[in-house]
């Protein structure tokens, strides 16, 4: 039984480790940028670190430069703790990859797991590129469309962003053609429109981008039979992964507890049933049946021997119980005369 209990506890532990993944003392917080991760030169961005864990302190630092770590006291509202870090006015030295951590009051030197990385990019440093659409900015639903970003500047990389999306696409610039460098972004069959912009950057300064191109509105006409959901629209079939992990972990714990309880109850019932059966065995199988020892008549004594619920009987017959049949030998007595002295 002890082996079964240990096995179930181990299974529950590893499943819970899968439902709630973490590296630090507490779960990782989330890091967001307001109004967005692309920040124009000299403007300010707010980096918000938040969590449903009641952290008292939040720390923010930029990768590669730990001396830039910032510390704020957390605010608590509606079960959420958060801290807003103001970064700006934006310069090249402030661009980079940021992470944040949480900490509670009684353990200020024990940090949570780090948040997911957030790239903060400074824009507006170089000449803006041009953005165009092929076959055009207005396409039929399901029709393929390609956006081309080009410039006379020798950018190594071009970046395409869609309004409302946090992540951008990037492609290396192609060879110079007719005095311009260009990168093509195939979007595939069009299902949803949107406003797009592109930027250029150099390989040795990936967080420093050019001015954005003029915005390009891509319109999709018609109703496709099977349209994909827009990346900016929440899907009703997709829930919060963290809440889903919590729900799965709780269900696993409850199931393991019920199985353990059923196993212990089954063992207890079996032991109790065996004890009752032993107490109710016939008394005749465990006692010696005999008459009063003072009587002279021969008698038969029957013993019952109990050995792990298997009964064997021995029948013992006293010598007087042997059959009273006359012996076959004939004995003849002869009277002899007394000898005189």
UniProtKB/Swiss-Prot annotation:
Record region (Disordered): 220-239
UniProt-annotated glycosylation sites, renumbered to this chain: 84, 178, 211
GO molecular function, one term: antigen binding
Topology term for the membrane: Single-pass type I membrane protein
Keywords per UniProt: Cell membrane, Disulfide bond, Glycoprotein, Immunoglobulin domain, Membrane, Receptor, Repeat, Signal, Transmembrane, Transmembrane helix
Record bears the keyword Cell membrane: yes
Classification via InterPro entries: Ig-like_dom_sf, Ig-like_fold, Ig-like_Receptors_ImmuneReg, Ig_sub, Immunoglobulin_dom
TM regions (residue ranges): 246-265
Cystine residue pairs: 49-100, 149-198
A GO biological process held by the record: immune response
Subcellular location field: Cell membrane
Domain Ig-like C2-type stretches: 42-107, 142-205
Topological domains annotated Cytoplasmic: 266-341
Signal sequence extent: 1-21
Family, similarity comment: Belongs to the immunoglobulin superfamily.
Biological function: Receptor on natural killer (NK) cells for HLA-C alleles (HLA-Cw1, HLA-Cw3 and HLA-Cw7). Inhibits the activity of NK cells thus preventing cell lysis.
Protein name: Killer cell immunoglobulin-like receptor 2DL3
């Amino acid at each position: 039984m002890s082996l079964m209990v240990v096995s179930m506890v181990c299974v529950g532990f590893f499943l819970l480790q899968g439902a709630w993944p973490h590296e630090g003392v507490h779960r990782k917080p989330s890091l967001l940028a307001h109004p967005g991760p692309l920040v124009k030169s000299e403007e300010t961005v707010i980096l918000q670190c938040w969590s449903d864990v009641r952290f008292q302190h939040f720390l923010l630092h930029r990768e590669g430069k730990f001396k830039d770590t910032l510390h704020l006291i957390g605010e608590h509202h509606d079960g959420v703790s958060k801290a807003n870090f103001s970064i700006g006015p934006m310069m090249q030295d402030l661009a980079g990859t940021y992470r944040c951590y949480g900490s509670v009051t009684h353990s200020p030197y024990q940090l949570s797991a780090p948040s997911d990385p957030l790239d903060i990019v400074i824009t507006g440093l170089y000449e803006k590129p041009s953005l165009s659409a092929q076959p055009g900015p207005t396409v039929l639903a399901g029709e393929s469309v390609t956006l081309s970003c080009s410039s006379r500047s020798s950018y190594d990389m071009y970046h395409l962003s869609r309004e409302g999306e946090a992540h951008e696409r990037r492609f290396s610039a192609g060879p110079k053609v007719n005095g311009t460098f260009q990168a093509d972004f195939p979007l595939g069959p069009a299902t949803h429109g949107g406003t797009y912009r592109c930027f250029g950057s150099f390989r040795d300064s990936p967080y420093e981008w050019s001015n954005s191109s003029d915005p390009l509105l891509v319109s999709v006409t018609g109703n496709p039979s099977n349209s994909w959901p827009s990346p900016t629209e929440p899907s009703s079939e997709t829930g919060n992964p963290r809440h889903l992990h919590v729900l799965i972990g709780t269900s696993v714990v409850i199931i393991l507890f019920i199985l353990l309880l059923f196993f212990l109850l089954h063992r207890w019932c079996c032991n109790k049933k065996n004890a009752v059966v032993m107490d109710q065995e016939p008394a005749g199988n465990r006692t010696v049946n005999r008459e009063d020892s003072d009587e002279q008549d021969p008698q038969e004594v029957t013993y019952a021997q109990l050995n792990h619920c298997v009964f064997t009987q021995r029948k013992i017959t006293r010598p007087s119980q042997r059959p009273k049949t006359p012996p076959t030998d004939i004995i003849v007595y002869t009277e002899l005369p007394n000898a005189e002295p």
